[in-house]
């Protein structure tokens, strides 16, 4: 028996609708990811550069490999994991670089940080290797963690590359609770504490040439 073109079109449309409906229901459902940042807890940036500025070039540095991306690293009983459904708004290494610049710009001391491609007389070269940037659950997975930021700083002469000084800086800031909303502020405080000490040390070590 011959079927009319209208009936055939209706049958095809119905079949297509069923197929599309099935495709929609098969798509995985993903939970929204919360985005956070750190490094904005510093003082306001100074409006003018201090007199007698010492030019310090910020050299390329290392960052803890597993923590350099946009995921938050946790350590529990020696096991490395990432906080679920939580991300930095940008890779941690990018936020760290911005925080370093902000810390030096906000300080009224003699040091002026010079970034790659920026003009200026280089008196010293500063290297900051971030060895640890993580939340440690030392008291168990259900307890509030401690955020650890550990940085190795080295300062060398801009003229002959001789080592002027080096030091390890570390901050351990306990979160007030085992919640992301309390862990993020601990990161902010740890970063601010370490950078404050680094700026003070750099100002004291990088004497005018």
Regions found by a protein language model. Give the residues of each.
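Bacterial N-terminal signal peptides that target proteins for export
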Residues: 2-12
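C-terminal motif of bacterial Sec signal peptides marking the signal peptidase cleavage site
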Residues: 19-22
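Surface-exposed short loop/turn segments
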Residues: 24-43, 107-159
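Short secondary-structure boundary motifs at beta->alpha junctions and helix caps
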Residues: 79-87, 159-200
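Sec-exported extracytoplasmic/periplasmic mature domains
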Residues: 101-109, 135, 199-206
């Amino acid at each position: 028996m011959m079927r009319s073109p209208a009936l055939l079109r209706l049958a095809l449309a119905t079949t297509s609708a069923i197929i599309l409906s099935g495709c929609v229901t098969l798509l995985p459902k993903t939970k929204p990811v919360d985005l956070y940042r750190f490094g904005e807890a510093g003082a306001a940036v100074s409006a003018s550069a201090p007199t007698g500025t010492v030019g310090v070039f910020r050299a390329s540095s290392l960052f803890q490999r597993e923590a350099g991306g946009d995921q938050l690293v946790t350590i529990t009983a020696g096991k490395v994991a990432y906080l679920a459904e939580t991300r930095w708004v940008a890779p941690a290494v990018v936020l760290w670089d911005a925080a370093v610049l902000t810390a030096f710009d906000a300080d009224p001391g003699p040091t002026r940080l010079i970034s790659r491609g920026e003009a200026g007389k280089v008196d010293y070269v500063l290297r900051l290797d971030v060895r640890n940037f993580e939340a440690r659950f030392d008291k168990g997975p259900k307890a509030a963690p401690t955020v650890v930021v550990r940085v190795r700083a080295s300062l060398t002469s801009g003229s002959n590359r001789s080592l002027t000084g080096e030091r390890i800086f570390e901050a351990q800031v306990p979160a007030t609770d085992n919640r992301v909303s309390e862990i993020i502020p601990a990161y902010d405080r740890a970063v601010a504490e370490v950078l404050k000490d680094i700026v003070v040390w750099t100002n004291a070590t990088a004497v005018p040439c």
